[in-house]
Amino acid sequence: MKLFFSLALFVVAADQFSKYVALRFLRDANQSISIIPNFFSFTYAENRGIAFGLEPAPPALLLLFTMMISAAVLWYVLRSNNRRLIFLLPFSLILGGGVGNMIDRMVRGYVVDFIYFNLYNGYVGNIYLSLWPIFNIADSAITIGGTMLLLFHRTLFPDDPIA
């Protein structure tokens, strides 16, 4: 369990530190710093919604939802007897990412996003399309953890008939 909590704490710390740097160097001076021209940049954004910029509910409800998901992940891991790394790793990434974004919602009322891959910006017919959202380390951890759960479902949950 030390590994589970250590990794979750590391994700929270890395996420919060990176957001501090984004707030300090991107918010007021330059909204964007190009790393690889026309492909990768650090671009400051305030996300009041959830993944991919969706705003399905008021901020207080999103905060409550984040708290409930984080509590459910923690409860599930503590209740389980499985202590293998392949089991703990995805859940620690999801918990750490959830807590990192939850801190932002509690302190600022929005989540700081700053990582941007410019995969495609342009028109498809008459519709303008921006193919990739701006995200942060917490979002990355949640996505990686969720992907691991999907990829290793049979290994993680061998008794599940869906596996």
From Swiss-Prot:
Membrane topology qualifier: Multi-pass membrane protein
Main localization category: membrane
Biochemical pathway: Protein modification; lipoprotein biosynthesis (signal peptide cleavage)
Single biological process term from Gene Ontology: proteolysis
Subcellular localization(s) per the UniProt record: Cell inner membrane
Originating species: Chlorobium chlorochromatii (strain CaD3)
Enzyme's top EC category: hydrolase
Transmembrane segments: 58-78, 84-104, 111-131, 132-152
Cross-referenced PROSITE patterns: SPASE_II (PS00855)
Gene: lspA
InterPro entries: Peptidase_A8 (IPR001872)
Protein name per Swiss-Prot or TrEMBL: Lipoprotein signal peptidase
UniProtKB keywords: Aspartyl protease, Cell inner membrane, Cell membrane, Hydrolase, Membrane, Protease, Transmembrane, Transmembrane helix
A Pfam match: Peptidase_A8
